[in-house]
Regions:
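Noncatalytic regulatory segments and standalone regulatory/sensor domains
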Residues: 44, 57-59, 63-78, 83-145
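Structural recognition of the beta-strand scaffold that forms the well-ordered cores
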Residues: 24-27, 49-53, 85, 95-97
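Cysteine-nucleophile protease catalytic domains, especially the papain-like/related folds used
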Residues: 1-48, 121-145
Length: 145
């Protein structure tokens, strides 16, 4: 069971860019992608990615559990959820801009990051620039990478 926070973030980013003149970006839900895939597609091209994992890469903890009013579905919260900005990688680590506890830019071992990202349902959002001649159409796939 999961709540799609990344969709809410993506929708809000899209609404914001559509209301401001001369800003031509699109929020892309990249949930389900590994950190490695996100680095290859975006970060290696200078575009950071909003990324969910666990705070300080702590172990995820299950609970509490409740029933969602609208659907009746049972929802289980995964504690230690944390969102940060994936900004880089080297052979051993992924690097994040993380304001938590004054971290600034911090690196974590790749295997640990992938595990904690998986624990939070591999949620991620990218913000991509749309090519000028496609701004009004806003077609998927017209972003610059």
């Amino acid at each position: 069971n999961r709540i799609f926070e990344e969709k809410a973030v993506a929708e809000k980013l899209q609404q914001q860019t559509e209301t401001e003149k001369n800003i031509h970006y699109r929020a892309v839900d990249e949930s389900g992608k590994t950190a490695e895939q996100l680095v290859e597609r975006y970060v290696s091209k200078g575009m950071p990615v909003i990324f969910w994992a666990c705070i300080n890469m702590r172990e995820p903890k299950t609970g509490p559990v409740w029933k969602l009013k609208e659907t009746g579905e049972t929802f289980t919260w995964i504690s230690n959820e944390h969102c940060m900005l994936l900004v880089g990688a080297d052979e051993e680590n992924y690097y994040f801009n993380d304001p938590y506890d004054g971290h600034g830019v911090i690196g974590y071992p790749k295997a640990l990051v992938e595990d904690r990202h998986q624990a939070q349902h591999m949620q991620a959002v990218a913000v991509v620039k749309i090519l000028e001649n496609d701004c009004e159409k806003r077609k998927p796939g017209t972003e610059t990478l």
